């Protein structure tokens, strides 16, 4: 995959998830299989997550070279942390199996795309 395609994909996914989580946190939560009605704090947490993803998208979109590579590394670290959080929550019974798979696979997919883009930046 050419590097600019990977960057564009990451910017698009992060923007969509970030804006979606901020603007419609309950809908976004349900799309990921979360029990939004059972957790009245979920919209607040979704908006925190949404702001982070939107900031990561902006950082990638607005930089080049070494600065862009740094944003990619930050995003990869966040994605790996998100994947681990999904696994831990699933193992502890804090997430249903379906939600565990969705949140973990989404985070791992974003991390893989970030790694591919980072390799392209360093080539």
Predicted regions: what is each one?
Residues 1-123:
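Short amphipathic, positively biased membrane-proximal segments
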């Amino acid at each position: 995959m050419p590097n600019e395609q990977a960057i564009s994909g990451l910017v698009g996914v992060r923007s969509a998830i970030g804006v979606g989580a901020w603007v419609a946190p309950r809908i976004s939560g349900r799309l990921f299989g979360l029990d939004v009605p059972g957790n009245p704090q979920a919209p607040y947490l979704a908006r925190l997550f949404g702001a982070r993803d939107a900031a990561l998208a902006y950082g990638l979109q607005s930089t080049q070279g070494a600065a862009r590579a740094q944003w990619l590394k930050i995003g990869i670290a966040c994605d790996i942390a998100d994947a681990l959080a999904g696994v831990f929550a699933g193992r502890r019974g804090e997430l249903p199996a379906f939600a565990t798979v969705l949140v973990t696979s989404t985070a791992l997919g974003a991390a893989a795309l970030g790694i591919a883009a980072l390799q392209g930046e360093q080539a």
